[in-house]
Structure formats: structure tokens, C-alpha cells
Amino acid sequence: MDYKSTLNLPKTDFAMQAGLPKREPVMLEKWYEDKVYETVLEKNDGKPLYVLHDGPPYANGDIHLGTALNKTLKDFIVRYKNMSGFKAPYVPGWDTHGLPTELKARKKAGVSNSTAISDIELRKLCREFALGYLDEQRNSFKRLGGIGEWDNPYVTLRKEFEAKQIEIFSEMATKGLIYKGLKPVYWCPECETALAEAEIEYAEDPCHSIYVKFRVTDDKGLLTPMGADLSKTYFVIWTTTTWTLPANVAICVGPEFEYALVKSGDEYYVMATALTESAMQAAGKTDYEILGTLKGSDLEYMKTAHPFIDRTSLVIVGDHVTLESGTGCVHTAPGHGVEDYDVCHNHYPEIPIVVPVDSHGKMTEEAGQFAGLTTEEANKAIAQHLEDTGALFALQKIIHQYPHCWRCKKPVLFRATEQWFCSVDAIKDQAIEAIKGVKWIPGWGEDRISSMVRDRNDWCISRQRRWGVPIPIFYCKDCGEPLIEKDAMHAVSELFRAEGSDAWYIKEAEEILPAGTKCKKCGCTSFTKERDIMDVWFDSGVTHAAVCDTRDYLHWPADLYLEGADQYRGWFQSSLLTSIAWRGKAPYKAVVTHGWVVDGQGRKMSKSLGNGILPQEIVDKYGADILRLWVASSDYHADIRLSLIHISEPTRRS
């Protein structure tokens, strides 16, 4: 018997299932038709302004779960503030310049050799590529349910943005904070450009740690009285970058450390007393004796012979020397190390800077018999030569953390080249003081960024590429003197505001510069233009000025920056440095960071593991609200686990 007709059951037209993948696009379309975002802001007119400044993603690929997490958290805050007595506009932004975009654009266009096309043709390819991905990402972010000024975002390639960027550069340059110098920088031989610290990723790398003997040629009369035979007396250095040995010009010791003269067989070695046992063990030498000791400062200005190049390596002192590993006698190549460069440049200006490696990562003629080899080939060849000539003291295989290029993932070099720098030292104390006035969430963020700023070197802001904002510097045709003048840079800013930065590659210097511009050094009136572009971290580092300070419905400084924890060394820091240089204070009142999205087992998502999940997969199958629910229920300060089980569970329960 059918009892259905006898039961008084409730009836409703309300769907038993949410059907989010189909219903959400309809709801979103109605939001935009009804101008919900604009209506909310209009309703909040007259209320206190709250500005969350959006960190710009790169417009060169599809969005991933990390960006989905980030944009959703921002949307929660913007909505909450608009419902809590504030007027909270949201201006999304995009970072559009840089090497990754250039390489992907060239690949898409089938241009394998960038020199095969003109500057303007290359820049056109890159612009179209970036704007295409900007549209795709914008649609993806809108599909996630985010409200904001999607039709009027800030974009780093727009004329008004580039003009403001030149203004900030000009302010910094005229304050003496921008300079050109020959200094060791991270250099990617694959991409053939300098890199900033924020563009470096560390990975484990197998290598050889090598101990090398440098024969003493002048002991200042201190070692022979202890019984040393100078013809058989050596300083023993230690390094993990064998290829830099052709650049060695000095041996650095700690001035306050104790150094021993060690006899083993018929040879004599100078090394730190505290490291003698480990060094002799590495060489397999068990029968040895210490004949005497000296302070490091006593060794200063002793001389040694380079083991395979006809050159003297001077013994110098430096406070950067440690007794953590090696021999306490530091191989010093100022052309390939920041600390080496600093100690030589500041205290031993007579020591030459030798850079026997070219932009492709190959040894030059200055490397002697190793010329033409790659650095990897040179590692093996030099070690073999040292062994053959008796200059090898010991060699061990180790695995260490080594810097790699963020783009090509290959090992980078430290290499001295002429680059443009921002003087961080000049503003470091002011920046650290400003950090104290910012609210950091989590609280440990303050210590983290403070230590990073305290320890960082001057910021290399030049790149040897063509897709980016040109460095607005001119050079005298006669004497080569750089022209760093406010009027000249103002002319560039106004040109970019009117025509965009492509004009730099179209117009001659004389068409850009104010009439009557002369070289201050020689009076010449003819100039050439700088070929390098600015680091993309400088682009994003000035967004606080180009957006928050420029749009009259926002304010500066921003109330909040919210990004992943990797931005302590990236956007948070570049924004802070440009802001301190420009206005002497931080560009944000509060900074919040979130963790990474990892798989259900806590592993990083990657193609090799096959554990990656695209936001679009979740949205298409379950709906954006389910993804938003996952974000809302997660502790975003730590790494967040995600699997399809995490996503499907709320759907099943509903």
C-alpha cells in the first residue's frame, strides 16, 4: 500500500542540493550588474577609511591554491571592515615586468633568441602576454567571490605607474641613496642577469670542500724562529667553491684568534689552533706537533704564493672570520664574495679585484690554464691540478645549502659586476626603528624582518634585461660620467606619463633631456641612455606610493599588508626600504602573514609528487563557497593541509 498520500509532509521549492558550481556564476553576475561593491562603499561614505593594500601577483601563469588562499583572506577582511563601521575599498594589482614573463612570452611566440627581435618588438610581446594572463587571473579571482575594483586595478606596466616609479627613484637618487659600483652580486649565468636576494632559493647541493696550501714567501721573521723552513711552510685555506681559486688575492685571518704553526713530516702549516685537529684529521695526518702559536693580528701582511697563478696572496685580518669550520684561514676573492669585497675595499684598497668568470659562467683568460671551462668543469680541473702539483692538503665530499636562481632553478654565482645599488646601509637604522611601530601578526614577524634588514647588503636594483622599467640615467658621451639630476629624471617621468616606458627605447637622449643639459664634469651636451632596467622588486616596492598615495580615495600609509611568510624577504622589505628612503616611515600600519598550502600529508604540492590541486578543480566540482569555507575554518598562520577529502567533507555533511 502507498502511504505517501496519507502523510502530511512539508513541501518546498528550495533545492535539496546547493548546486554551487552552476548557481554561483549567476549570483556573481547579478552582483556585478547591481554594483554591489560600489553600493557598499557608497553606503559607507563618511566612515573611517580602511586600506588593505594588495600585493601584486605576477601576471604570467594560472592562479594556484596559495593565491586563492591569499585573495580569499583579503576578501574576508575587506567585507568584514565594510560591515564594521569602516569604508574599505579594495584595489587589486598585478606585477607585469620581469624575466619570467619575458621568457614565457618569448617561448609562446617561438622566439628562442632575444637578440633576433628589437627592443620594442620584445616589449610588445611581453606586454600582450602579461595583459592576457592578467585577464585570466582577474576572471579566476572574481570567480572566487572576491569584491573589489576589478575594472580599475593597478598594473605596473601602466604609464601613470611607471611615471610614479621614476619619481620615487629620482627622490632616492637625489638624496644620494642610488649609486653605481663594482660589487659582488648574485649572478645567474643561465639568465645572464644580476639577481636580488629575494630572487634566490636555497637548495641542497653536493660539492667538494677543499683544503689548499699557499706557500709562505714572507713570514715577517716570525715563523722561522719557531723552526719553520719557509720553503716548506704553508697557510692552509678551505673553500667549497673551488672555481673561485683563480680569483684568490688574499688569505684572511681573525685578528683575535690564536693560530698554530703545525709540523707534520717535513712540512709546516699555519692554521687556527682550535681547528687544527679537525683539519689534520681531514688530511689523514695523525702524526703532527704544534711548534708555537701567534695571534691572527701578528700574521697580517705576511705574504704567500698563489698555488697556480703567478701572484702574491696577502695575509689580511677581518672580523668576519669564524672558527665554525675550515682552518680559520679564509680564502679571499673579493670578486666573488661580499665579505671578501668589503674587507678588501674598506681596509686593503691596494688589493686588486679579480673576476675570472664571464657572464655565461665560463672562466676567462685571467683563470690561466682553466680558461674556457664552465665553473663546474673548473671545480674538477682545479682540484686535479692541485693534487698533481702537491698543493692539495685535503678534499672531502659534502652537501651544503647553495643559492639557486628562482627562475631557472640552477646554481648562481657570486660575481663582481658594475650594477646600480640602493644604499641600504644609509637607511638601515631608520628602517629598523620604523619596524617597531608596525603591528606584526604573528608577533615573531617583527624579529624576523628586523634581522633580515639588519643583515642585508646594499640592494642591487639593476637587471640586464629589456622587459621592465628603464633606469633613468644618462651618460656623458665624452667622459662617461653618469648624469644623476632631478630635472633629467623629471623629464623621464613626464615622458613615461605621456607615452609609457617604450619611449625610452624609441627616443634619443637629446629628445628626452631638457634643453641645455650639460655634463657637470666636462660640459659635454651629448649623452647616451642606460641600458639596464629596474629590479621587479623595485616595481612592486613602490606600489604604496603609486597606488595608496596617488588614488585620492585611498590613504598612505596602508592599514594592512597581508601576504605569505616568504614576503618578509620580498615585498614587505622592498616596500619598507623605498618608503623609508622616500618619506622616512613604514608604508604599512600592520602586516599579517599566512602559511603555505600543503597536501593532506603535509608535503609541498609539486608536479613531481603529483599531489597538486588547482583552485579551478575545486570550484568546478564543489563551488567557490566550499573553498572559501575551507579558508575560513583553517589556522592560516601555519601551513594549511588540503586534500579533496578536506574539501568534500563539508559538502557531504550539508
What label would you give each PLM region?
Residues 69-72, 373-377, 513:
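Aromatic- and glycine-enriched glycan-recognition loops and surfaces
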Residues 250, 257-329, 338-342:
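Protease-associated
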Residues 44-47, 55-56, 89-102, 153-161, ...:
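Short, solvent-exposed turn/loop segments enriched in Gly/Ser/Thr/Pro and often Arg
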Residues 2-13, 17-20, 26, 30-34, ...:
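Residue patterns forming the tRNA-binding/recognition surfaces of aminoacyl-tRNA synthetases
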Residues 89, 246-292, 393-424, 648, ...:
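Structured, non-catalytic alpha/beta "coupling" segments that mediate domain-domain communication
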